[in-house]
UniProtKB/Swiss-Prot annotation:
Site (Involved in the stabilization of negative charge on the oxyanion by the formation of the oxyanion hole): 127-128
Pfam families found in the cross-reference section: ArgJ
Family: Belongs to the ArgJ family.
Molecular-function GO terms, alphabetical: glutamate N-acetyltransferase activity; L-glutamate N-acetyltransferase activity
Primary subcellular site in the record, as a coarse category: cytoplasm
Top EC class of this enzyme: transferase
Annotated source species: Staphylococcus aureus (strain MRSA252)
Compartments where located: Cytoplasm
Protein's recorded name: Arginine biosynthesis bifunctional protein ArgJ
One GO CC term, this protein: cytoplasm
Gene name for this UniProt entry: argJ
Length: 413
């Protein structure tokens, strides 16, 4: 399929129509059904034709799953170099002890043998039910098909990493660096157990840009802090979260770092990809009907702005009110008040879908019908101005519907 581009407003990059994880030069991706799920795809992979500078950030849950432990160790041993990633859904390989570690490493070995690369250049990831061992006979079957062109489509990869997601999440953008066109692609999964810091979510980013691993890690950490770490669905933090980026340097240009004259252009495009994927995850929250964006400004510090935003979007009462299309702004100011951050009610201003509801800590009369009409929209925005400083942040989440309980009450059955 020929990719089409549209220029993103106010940005120096273009969004590639139908762009995906394998749009950057030198990358392929694929996926297939190996029997971990009843009939859906459950095993996927990404491969770069050349060694790629790589970096990853991981869950803060202390019960870190085996594949994350193995991948983190792999990146340390390889000094931030990867050439392939393999991921399975339906089984988290978490709380599986040494056998889980051994199974993840065996998966690495099988993939490396098929691709004829060192095992320390293979990352592994898993998502799904916690506490069950991987059926290694099925995993081996998957690894044996990595070179099979019949399964080598990015769409198959996008499907293979899903669990309770209702849709795939992918994007690619292109930009000009040193007169050369470079591309950044991304794919993610996540629907339930989404909460800062990074919850049951996996995100993978590829680029054909030339950039070193240490610079890539700094960029990924910075971007994750205000994108993936600013989303919440249900307040639970998973054992398997990971965001991983690979840059295979297929496009030759001056090495990108903070001293490059177009560094900020690259950062802008990279952040856009991360933000797009993070919002797609929040929008696809289990049972969700609305995406909630909370913009906090005027905070004393960036940490306060982030914490207040996340507190509001994590509130079950706020989420329930949005689902019910009820302009109950009292739940918003209550969340602000118990956030633990420095606030002054007399300086606080709140808007719901651009309609003022609180001014200097006092309720503002508003047209109930006009407000009700805006709350039927799929996108709901809460703006909070604290009037204390210059720090700002945005958090993303979704409403809380009846379907959330239905989905999670029967997750293992």
């Amino acid at each position: 399929m020929k990719h089409q581009e549209t220029t993103s407003q106010q940005h120096n990059f273009s969004i590639i129509k139908h762009g995906d994880i394998s749009t950057p030069q030198g990358f392929t991706a694929g996926g297939m059904h190996i029997g971990l799920r009843a009939n859906k795809k459950d095993f996927g992979w990404i491969y770069s034709s050349s060694l790629a500078s790589s970096a990853a950030v991981y869950t803060l849950n202390q019960f870190k799953a085996a594949p994350l432990i193995v991948t983190e160790d792999t990146l340390q041993k390889s000094k931030g170099k990867l050439q392939a990633l393999v991921v399975n859904s339906a089984n988290a390989n978490s709380c599986t002890g040494q056998q889980g570690i051994d199974d993840a490493q065996q998966t690495q070995t099988w993939v490396a043998q098929q691709l004829q690369i060192p095992s320390e250049h293979v990352a592994v990831a898993s998502t799904g039910v916690i506490g069950e061992y991987l059926p290694m006979d099925k995993i081996k079957t998957g690894t044996e098909h990595i070179n099979d062109a019949n399964f080598a489509t990015p769409g198959a990869f996008n499907e293979a990493i899903l669990t309770t997601d209702t849709c795939t999440k992918h994007i690619a953008v292109s930009l000009n660096i040193d007169g050369k066109t470079i591309t950044i692609g991304g794919s993610a999964k996540g629907s339930g157990m989404i909460h800062p810091n990074m919850a049951t979510m996996l995100a993978f980013i590829t680029t054909d840009a030339s950039i070193e691993s240490n610079t890539l890690h700094q960029l990924l950490k910075s971007s994750t802090d205000h994108t993936f770490n600013m989303i919440t669905v249900d307040g639970d933090t998973s054992t398997n979260d990971m965001v991983l980026v690979m840059a295979n340097q297929q496009v030759e240009h001056q090495i990108l770092n903070q001293d490059h004259p177009q560094w900020e252009t690259f950062v802008d495009a990279f952040n856009f990809v991360c933000t797009f994927l993070a919002k797609a995850i929040a929008r696809d929250g289990e049972g969700a009907t609305k995406l909630i964006s909370v913009n906090v400004s005027g905070a004393k510090s960036i940490s306060d702005a982030r914490k207040i935003g996340k507190t509001i979007v994590s509130s079950n009462l706020v989420k329930s009110a949005i689902f019910g299309e009820d302009a109950n702004f009292g739940r918003i100011i209550t969340a602000i008040g118990y956030s633990g951050c420095e606030i002054d009610p007399n300086c606080t201003y709140v808007q719901l879908n651009q309609i003022p509801v609180v001014d200097k800590g006092m309720a503002v009369l508003f047209d109930e019908q006009a407000m009700s009409n805006t709350l039927t929209h799929e996108n709901v925005t809460i703006d909070v101005q604290l009037g204390l400083g210059n720090a700002a942040a945005t958090a993303y989440g979704c409403d809380l519907s009846y379907d959330y309980v239905r989905i999670n009450a029967s997750y293992r059955t």
